[in-house]
Each structure stands twice: as C-alpha cells, then as structure tokens.
Amino acid sequence: MENWREISEDIVSSLLEDGSDPEILYEVEHHFVCEDFPKLEQAALAAFKLGYDVEEPAELELEDGAKIWSFDIVVESELDVDVIMEDVDKLAALAVECEVEYDGWGTYFQE
C-alpha cells in the first residue's frame, strides 16, 4: 500500500514552496483505475452514494497499448494535509472494498 500521508505532505509542501495560495479552496482530484469496467462502475456508484462528486468514467490507453478504465472524484478542499487525508483514507478504503485501484490525488497551483 502506498504511503499516502507522505505523498500528500510532499504535494502540499511543493505547492506551498512554489507560492500557491494557502488561503483558498482547491479542486482536489482523486483518481481511480481498474481494468474491469463493472468494478470501476461499482466504485463510482459507491462514492456517489457517499456524497462525492464523481466524474464520468473514461477509457485510457497505457504506454504498452493496454486499455484501462478510470474516473475522478473532485472535492473542494483546503490545501491542508490532514483535511485531504480524511478523503484519501475514505477513498482508498473504498477502492479496496470495490477491488479497484486508488491512484492518488492531485490539484493545480493557485496564486
């Protein structure tokens, strides 16, 4: 299992060091992937039922030509590791339960 806290701390500190505004809300995108579309769909539905804003699934092509399904969950959040980790912990557990992969999160620099 990934060390999501350490990864989250690195992302947040990098954004803040680059001058991103710590006082505004950010759109945090949580990424999910799976080769099995029905499992991915089940995870998306479960996240929606928990109140998350679920984006439409998309089929992606990997570098080796293989196909994989993905979707994102978008959450407005402070740029705060503890706040973000609340969602990471819930969503990573949901991914395990639904047998899909939680592929981390990201956001964009904001001035």
UniProtKB/Swiss-Prot annotation:
Molecular function via GO: endoribonuclease inhibitor activity; enzyme binding
UniProt keywords, alphabetically: Cytoplasm
Pfam families: RraB (PF06877)
SUPFAM superfamilies reported for this sequence: Hypothetical protein VC0424
Disulfide bonds: none
Compartments in which it is found: Cytoplasm
InterPro entries: RraB, RraB-like_sf, RraB_dom
The UniProt record lists the keyword Cytoplasm: yes
GO cellular component: cytoplasm
Keyword Chaperone (UniProt): no
Family note: Belongs to the RraB family.
Function: Globally modulates RNA abundance by binding to RNase E (Rne) and regulating its endonucleolytic activity. Can modulate Rne action in a substrate-dependent manner by altering the composition of the degradosome.
Subunit structure: Interacts with the C-terminal region of Rne.
Cross-referenced HAMAP family: RraB (MF_01888)
Name used for this protein in its record: Regulator of ribonuclease activity B
Species of provenance: Pseudoalteromonas translucida (strain TAC 125)
Gene: rraB
